[in-house]
Regions:
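Flexible, glycine/small-residue-enriched loop-and-beta-strand segment within the central core
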Residues: 1-60, 87-97
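Beta-rich strand-turn-strand
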Residues: 51-67, 72-76
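Extended alpha-helical regions
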Residues: 70, 83, 90-92
Length: 97
């Protein structure tokens, strides 16, 4: 729909999704699939590692030499030479028998 560009030597884990568009939703009287799309470029630099299950949304530039950890949702641009990861707290609870 718009443009997706991937630099040299960039690698992707399983199930990475890249979206260069999104649905418009401005008119409550129309179904969402009748309202068209908003488009935007996605540019991924060279020598990047994009982990499994990462989602990259429109209007994003990922610089060179970037590592993105598994499961991240990238909704804003990432400068070169950066590491991005999800810092979620993992809660483990034991069953009471």
């Amino acid at each position: 729909m718009s443009e997706i560009s991937i630099g040299d030597n960039s690698q992707f884990g399983e199930s990475v999704k890249i979206y260069d568009h999104n649905h418009q939703y401005r008119n409550l009287n129309l179904l969402i699939n009748q309202q068209g799309y908003v488009k935007g470029k996605v540019i991924i630099g060279s020598n990047c590692w994009i982990g499994s299950n990462v989602v990259i949304l429109k209007d994003v530039v990922i610089g060179d030499n970037v590592v993105i950890g598994a499961g991240c949702v990238i909704f804003k641009s990432i400068p070169s030479n950066s590491i991005v990861y999800n810092n979620q707290n993992l809660t483990v609870t034991k069953y009471k028998v």
